[in-house]
Amino acid sequence: MANNTPFAAQPLLTSSELPLTLISLDDWALVTLTGADRVKYLQGQVTADIDALPTDQHVLCAHCDAKGKMWSNLRLFYRGEGLAFIERRSVLDNQLSELKKYAVFSKVVIAAQPDAVLLGVAGTQAKAVLAEVFAELPNADHPVVQQGDSTLLYFSLPAERFLLVTDTEQAQQLVEKLADRAQFNNSKQWLALDIEAGFPIIDTDSSAQFIPQATNIQALNGISFSKGCYTGQEMVARAKYRGANKRALYWLAGSANRAPAVGEDLEWQLGENWRRTGSVLAAITLSDGTVWVQAVLNNDLAADSVLRVRDDAESVLTIQPLPYSLTEDK
């Protein structure tokens, strides 16, 4: 298979409906950091404590500007001799140039890896099928496993699924193995699962717009409040200790004539009136016509609030429960 050639689009399904599915993650990109200073350098750039990251764990953290606004969020893990992270392809070039700004002063090489193949495996029997190909699989206790040139990541949300970072040869083997047994789909299916999981999606139109807490990164254990300095730390800390953050990530579901675009606001019902509010991070339409929206909204929104897509009077969107708690330890 060609590198990151997307599979044909299929109807999108919820995690509970999904049959065995191999997903081309062409909307995501891989970056690696190698060199003696890789950990030290990244420690000064992202919200997670890289010094404390075990080699068998991955973390969703944020890379911020000096004002604490996220250039991107990063799914960070060890791969081979270095560190690696996955982010949305749309923000890759800009985020990478920001991350590299001070790299000339350190022994670190930061590089996109366009030849790497990213695949998702989800749905019924995903684990059993991968066990036929790989000697060891990641799990809830050890969510990162290295095998040869492949790195496997385990996710429990919204249901058991796997992300594979590999080369063209191994990817082709998996494609052939699953040819008669699995549905193939493109990145939109993985996006749907991320929305269901409450994992924030940062694309170009939402880059440098939000502090990490506005997208629930703290609830996903992606912010260390005890590590040393990193870019944007002061603003991120202020949001926690001074209550400066008034927003949160929400998963909305319902009916609409269209899926709203990234960066659009929504309309919130107040009695007989509608008020514009929030900002859309991602939206998809499922096979049954249901629209899912991931949006940043006021964090004091009542659970029974009714929203709609802007200028769509027939639209009705309601708040769905996220599979994790937003209650913070004080």
Swiss-Prot record:
**Any one Gene Ontology molecular-function term assigned to this protein's record:** folic acid binding
Print the keywords alphabetically: Cytoplasm, Folate-binding, tRNA processing
Which coarse location class describes where this protein primarily resides?
cytoplasm
Is the keyword Cytoplasm in the record?
Answer: yes
InterPro entries recorded: GCV_T_N, GcvT/YgfZ_C, tRNA-modifying_YgfZ, YgfZ/GcvT, YgfZ/GcvT_CS, YgfZ_barrel
Localization per record: Cytoplasm
Where is folate bound in this sequence? W28, W190
Q: Which residues form a coiled coil?
A: none
Q: Which GO terms describe its cellular component?
A: cytoplasm
One of its GO biological process terms is: RNA modification
Q: Cytoplasm: is it a keyword of this entry? A: yes
Role: Folate-binding protein involved in regulating the level of ATP-DnaA and in the modification of some tRNAs. It is probably a key factor in regulatory networks that act via tRNA modification, such as initiation of chromosomal replication.
Give the matching HAMAP family.
Answer: tRNA_modifying_YgfZ
Q: According to its UniProt record, which protein family does this protein belong to? A: Belongs to the tRNA-modifying YgfZ family.
Q: What is the protein's given name?
A: tRNA-modifying protein YgfZ
